[in-house]
């Protein structure tokens, strides 16, 4: 497994950063191309990664999934 060997055979042609998986390189390349395929249906924001869109959607839904360990507020 590449995780344990440190092997990173997929190299970005723009900045030379290396990746263990080809899909990680593909996602990374969006930083260079400016492609933002994930669109918010509530506003005009666009995102490179779907995880960033999911986090952003909390702005619209009011979801606050994390609780403060000290005061228990969300």
Curated annotation (Swiss-Prot):
Gene Ontology MF annotations: DNA binding; DNA-binding transcription factor activity, RNA polymerase II-specific; zinc ion binding
Highest taxon of the lineage: Eukaryota
Zinc finger (C2H2-type) in chain: 1-4, 10-32, 38-60, 66-74
SMART domains the UniProt entry points to: ZnF_C2H2
InterPro entries: Znf_C2H2_sf (IPR036236), Znf_C2H2_type (IPR013087)
UniProt key word Cytoplasm: no
Key word DNA-binding present: yes
This protein's UniProt keywords: Developmental protein, DNA-binding, Gap protein, Metal-binding, Nucleus, Repeat, Zinc, Zinc-finger
One Pfam family linked to the record: zf-C2H2
GO cellular component terms, semicolon-separated: nucleus
GO biological process terms on file: segmentation
Function recorded in the entry: Krueppel is a gap class segmentation protein.
PANTHER family (alphabetical): MYONEURIN, ZINC FINGER PROTEIN
Protein family membership: Belongs to the krueppel C2H2-type zinc-finger protein family.
Name of the protein this chain belongs to: Protein krueppel
